[in-house]
Amino acid sequence: MKLTFLGTGAAIPTKYRAHPSISLKFDGEIFLFDCGENTQRQIIFTDVSPMKINNIFISHLHGDHILGLPGLLQSVAFQGRTKPLNIYGPEETAKMLENILNVGYHSIDYPINVYEISSKTPEKIISTDNYEVYSFPVVHSVPALAYVFRQVKKPRMDLEKVNKLGIEIGPDLKRLKDGFSVELNGKIITLEDVTLPPKKGICVGYSGDTIPLNEFAEFLRELKCTTLIHEATFDKTMDKNAKETLHSTVHDALNIAKLSGVNTVILTHISARYDELSAFENDIVEFKAENPDLHVLIAEDLMEYSLK
C-alpha cells in the first residue's frame, strides 16, 4: 500500500506545489483523494495509472480541490475507459460535476456514479472484504469532509488448533476457510474454533481542509489509525489567519496527530506564502521536543510514502 502526493499546495499553486490531490494504491486499485487542477499531469510523473482509479473522494467543493476533475475524466475516456467511476463528496457534488462537464464539449461514455455524503455525521461509505472507507464531517467555510481508509484483515488459521482437532487438509478445511461449519467425530466445528484474531490492518486518515477537531482525533483513535495526512496551511505565528480562514497550523495538525494516537503525520496543503519551510521545521522541532515518538513529514509534490 502506497501514498503518492500529486499536489501539496493550497489555494494558489506555486512552482513547487500543485493543487491538492493524493493517491492511495491498494491491491492493484487507485483511490484518489481530491483532484485539484493539474492532477492528471502530475500523474504522468508517477507510477499511478489513471485507468485504475475507480473511486475519487472530494473533501469539499473549493476550486483548488476539484478543478482537475474534467481533464482527468476526459483523458481516461480518451484512453477507452468503460468501467464505472465513483465520485464521493459533500452536498452539491452532483451539481458541481454537472456544471463542470457542461462547459465545453466532453466525450465521456462510461458511467459516473456520484454519491453525496452528509456533512453532519460520520459514515461508513464503502465496505468490502478487504477495505472500508469512512467519511467524517469537518469544519471549513463550506461543507467539508475528512476521509479514513482502513484495510480489513481476515482471521488467521491456527494450524495448531487445526491439528489438535484432527482436521486434515481437504474438503473440511476448505469449508472452514470459506466460513462454513463442519462436523467431525460428532462435534460441530466453526471457523472461530480454528482461527487467531486478525492482524491489525493499515488505517490512514485524510483531513481535507479544516480547523483542528478533537472529535476527528477521537474518531481516528477509535479506528486505530496509524497514519494521518493533515492540512497545515500556516505556521503557528499565523494562528489568527488560520482561525479566520478555518484552516489549521502546523501545531494544530501535530496536536491532532498526538491526540489520535497515530504513529505518523504527514503535513500538506501548504500556503503559497512559504517559499521555504524553516518556520514549519521550527514548529516541528519545538513539538517533537515533548513528543519525540511522533514521526512527522512535510509532504512534497510527487513524494511517495509506503504504508506498512
UniProtKB/Swiss-Prot annotation:
GO terms for molecular function: 3'-tRNA processing endoribonuclease activity; zinc ion binding. Its cofactor is Zn(2+). It is an enzyme of class 3 (hydrolase). Zn(2+) 2 binds at D64, H65, D209, H269. Belongs to the RNase Z family. Zinc phosphodiesterase, which displays some tRNA 3'-processing endonuclease activity. Probably involved in tRNA maturation, by removing a 3'-trailer from precursor tRNA. PANTHER family: ZINC PHOSPHODIESTERASE ELAC PROTEIN 1. This is Ribonuclease Z.
